């Protein structure tokens, strides 16, 4: 989230005197920029909303190994075995719905394929939303009949309006009634502004996405990059 990123950068600068230049965007936008800058690397540290995309960067040999300070205090499973991905924060995805269109909703994931929700459901684009990509991966690997459930959504008129914000906007305006794999902080931010939204987490469970912070092997400022990850 932009506010969290800005606060972290400001706090790091206050502590170390090192200025932080940021590029903020969707997971897809960040990965595209890194690819465009391969011949002339600019970034030192990358934080994504998708652990799976971080693993992809690791597999491609893009990441530097580092054992950060306070690594023993990080949640179990939030650092990979090679000390290349560090969970810096997390988001939980749930079901966001428009309370004007649907006053109350508590349907489980599979029940969102019911006829009463025909053509009312949307989901973020997983090519642009790292949180959604990890949610779908969790559905496939961690839930019984996950693939069948996703197919049932498609059969029930599921649409893909765009990245997280575009998908949420479709529900906020009432164009759609329900957003599957909605990011929690986006929902709470909109609700605080008075938008007719609510969010819940289905009874069968959901996916919590650690956001990996990673040091690039090509980091022009390697010492500062390691210091920033230590700070996180």
Protein language model regions, located:
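Short, catalytically relevant binding-site loops at active-site mouths
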Residues: 167, 184-188, 204-207
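Extracytoplasmic ligand-binding site segments that recognize negatively charged/polar headgroups
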Residues: 1-6, 21, 25-31, 35, ...
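A ligand-binding cleft/hinge motif common to bilobed small-molecule-binding domains
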Residues: 52-56, 177-196
């Amino acid at each position: 989230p932009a506010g969290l990123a800005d606060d972290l950068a400001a706090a790091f600068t206050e502590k170390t005197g090192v200025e932080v230049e940021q590029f903020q965007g969707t997971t897809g936008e960040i990965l595209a920029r890194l690819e465009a800058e391969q011949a002339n690397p600019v970034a030192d540290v990358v934080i994504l909303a998708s652990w799976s995309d971080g693993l992809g960067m690791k597999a491609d040999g893009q990441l530097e190994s580092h054992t950060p300070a306070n690594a023993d205090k990080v949640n179990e499973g939030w650092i990979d075995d090679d000390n290349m991905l560090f969970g810096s924060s997390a988001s939980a995805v749930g079901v966001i719905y428009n309370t004007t269109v649907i006053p109350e909703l508590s349907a489980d994931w599979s029940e969102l394929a019911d006829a009463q929700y025909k053509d009312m459901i949307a989901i973020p684009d997983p090519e642009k939303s790292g949180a959604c990509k990890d949610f779908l991966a969790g559905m496939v690997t961690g839930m019984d009949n996950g693939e069948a459930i996703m197919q049932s959504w498609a059969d029930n008129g599921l649409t893909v309006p765009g990245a997280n914000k575009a998908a949420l906007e479709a529900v906020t305006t009432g164009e759609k009634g329900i957003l599957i794999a909605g990011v929690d902080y986006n929902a709470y931010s909109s609700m605080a502004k008075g938008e007719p939204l609510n969010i819940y987490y289905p009874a069968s469970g959901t996916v919590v996405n650690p956001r990996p912070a990673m040091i690039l092997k090509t980091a022009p400022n390697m010492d500062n990059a390691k210091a920033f990850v230590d700070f996180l």
